[in-house]
Amino acid sequence: MEGESVKPSPQPTAQAEDEEKNRRTVTVNAAHMGKAFKVMNELRSKRLLCDVMIVAEDVEVEAHRVVLAACSPYFCAMFTGDMSESKAKKIEIKDVDGQTLSKLIDYIYTAEIEVTEENVQVLLPAASLLQLMDVRQNCCDFLQSQLHPTNCLGIRAFADVHTCTDLLQQANAYAEQHFPEVMLGEEFLSLSLDQVCSLISSDKLTVSSEEKVFEAVISWINYEKETRLDHMAKLMEHVRLPLLPRDYLVQTVEEEALIKNNNTCKDFLIEAMKYHLLPLDQRLLIKNPRTKPRTPVSLPKVMIVVGGQAPKAIRSVECYDFEEGRWDQIAELPSRRCRAGVVFMAGHVYAVGGFNGSLRVRTVDVYDGVKDQWTSIASMQERRSTLGAAVLNDLLYAVGGFDGSTGLASVEAYSYKTNEWFFVAPMNTRRSSVGVGVVEGKLYAVGGYDGASRQCLSTVEQYNPATNEWIYVADMSTRRSGAGVGVLSGQLYATGGHDGPLVRKSVEVYDPGTNTWKQVADMNMCRRNAGVCAVNGLLYVVGGDDGSCNLASVEYYNPVTDKWTLLPTNMSTGRSYAGVAVIHKSL
């Protein structure tokens, strides 16, 4: 009414607003957009309402401007700007092949695309051009999943050209972490001088010894010797010679013709020799890039358990993840295999010889952890089961074993560089069910069964590759056939095994410096025919049998506490005569 003041409406409180919202119901149909794009794609396939034709090479693709603009900033700028293409009915896209353009426009409508080894190198730059960043990322993820010692340098170069920063860093880290395998490949040998220098100068290079870096330099020079000879000094500047063992400097580096014929390289060698003559406290005072130890990023490791008897020969392969404390099944062997020799060499796991359930075999299968697949390589000269296998100086040795009728004293070696097997000196004693290990450049054959005396053996032999001779060293304290043999901190361990019907849980350790064996703590369980490996300062003994049943349990020994501890998780199946190797966990 006239003359009366009007009161302002009260402001709604936050609580009242929430209550009002709760009274309103907003329905979101998650499938709506998908249905809409499905219909738009159907219209496109029927050429209905299309208002633009995109052309690449001889491929013409009809489409809807609004759809292309909504999904691709490249097309959005083209259709909404002042360029002539904004009105054109037909638009040619250069630098993209027709098939790839068609795939990417399909993706815009369907959100589906298949990235393969065959198309990724054309798909990624085309997706970058059209600013389809999800597809570009899919391509990068695919390439990252395909990283392998044979292709990581090529992927790194590809990532660099196309400014894929994360992929570039991942490929570079992969090359550093897998350098001993990368240096064997064609991609490494084809690198430029600057690229090799950049790689071998990295503190993050993962090498067990600086020997690998020296060998890589020599290989790279020799690959194109005439044109690369002048680069020797530049490369040797990045090899940390003072960190090499003195014996290697004298026997290998000093004798290398490429070093002898280059005064600068000889100076680097003299620097290294002088470094070794200094007392330790004075060495620590020398600060230059060649005396600085590398500090690689340690890759997590996994343990691979290959084949075995359960109770018959099996194809199954299990993998134990030390970080996560769990077992997983991985790619099976191509055929049943137990009583094989299993080793890790040059980035791969080798399963050598063994028994397939009916025959002793000569065949060898190789596992690639990155691809999770097995392939076959050259077979041994002789059939061998219950053999010992070990790696020494980049050669795989197959020691002794049983050929189906007799125990073997023969030994053969395999070079992965030539894919060939050749015999070396035989042992002094026939040994089946023999355990082997490498300590300080010597190969040891421990115990076993000789078949002639019908007794298990306590004797041990040592092979020197420099003289191609076997000699006896100190006997074990007890006879052991089927002992699990492993190396930890420069000492040789013999675990369990049996003497006739008696299966042992005792363990003894050999010190090559004193040529003596001593007893350490017993295992928790009696085991023979178990697999053994050393990881992170611990010795793992895997499976085996106790004389009556196969074991799924695993236990590890800590030399600091002299104690054995059972892993809390067992393998999925009890395995005797399985082989064990440790590899880097795939990224």
From Swiss-Prot:
Disruption phenotype: Mice display pseudohypoaldosteronism type II (PHA2)-like phenotype, such as salt-sensitive hypertension. In kidney, increased level of Wnk1 and Wnk4 kinases is observed, while Wnk1 and Wnk4 levels are unchanged in other tissues.
This protein's GO CC annotations: Cul3-RING ubiquitin ligase complex; cytoskeleton; cytosol
Keyword annotations from UniProtKB, A to Z: Actin-binding, Cytoplasm, Cytoskeleton, Kelch repeat, Phosphoprotein, Repeat, Ubl conjugation pathway
Posttranslational mods: Phosphorylation at Ser-433 by PKA or PKC decreases the interaction with WNK1 and WNK4, leading to inhibit their degradation by the BCR(KLHL3) complex. Phosphorylated at Ser-433 by PKC in response to angiotensin II signaling, decreasing ability to promote degradation of WNK1 and WNK4, leading to activation of Na-Cl cotransporter SLC12A3/NCC. Phosphorylation at Ser-433 is increased by insulin. Dephosphorylated at Ser-433 by calcineurin PPP3CA, promoting degradation of WNK1 and WNK4.
Domain BACK as annotated: residue spans: 152-254
Pfam families: BACK, BTB, Kelch_1
Acyltransferase in keyword set: no
GO molecular function, one term: cullin family protein binding
Region (Disordered): 1-24
Tissue: Present at high level in brain and kidney (at protein level). Weakly expressed in other tissues. In kidney, predominantly localizes to the distal convoluted tubule (DCT) and collecting duct, with apical localization in the DCT (at protein level).
Pathway membership: Protein modification; protein ubiquitination
Phosphoserine PTM sites in chain numbering: 376, 433
Stretches forming Kelch repeats: 302-347, 348-394, 396-441, 442-490, 491-537, 539-585
Domain spans labelled BTB: 50-117
Biological process annotations from GO: distal tubule morphogenesis; gene expression; monoatomic ion homeostasis; potassium ion homeostasis; proteasome-mediated ubiquitin-dependent protein catabolic process; protein catabolic process; protein K48-linked ubiquitination; protein polyubiquitination
Subcellular location: Cytoplasm, Cytosol; Cytoplasm, Cytoskeleton
Lineage top rank: taxon: Eukaryota
Main location: cytoplasm
Residues modified as Phosphothreonine: 295, 375
Family stated for the protein in its record: Belongs to the KLHL3 family.
Chain's role: Substrate-specific adapter of a BCR (BTB-CUL3-RBX1) E3 ubiquitin ligase complex that acts as a regulator of ion transport in the distal nephron. The BCR(KLHL3) complex acts by mediating ubiquitination and degradation of WNK1 and WNK4, two activators of Na-Cl cotransporter SLC12A3/NCC in distal convoluted tubule cells of kidney, thereby regulating NaCl reabsorption. The BCR(KLHL3) complex also mediates ubiquitination of CLDN8, a tight-junction protein required for paracellular chloride transport in the kidney, leading to its degradation.
Description of how the protein assembles with itself and partners: Homodimer. Component of the BCR(KLHL3) E3 ubiquitin ligase complex, at least composed of CUL3 and KLHL3 and RBX1. Interacts with CLDN8.
Name by which UniProt lists this protein: Kelch-like protein 3
Organism: Mus musculus
Taxon lineage: Eukaryota, Metazoa, Chordata, Craniata, Vertebrata
Gene this chain is encoded by: Klhl3
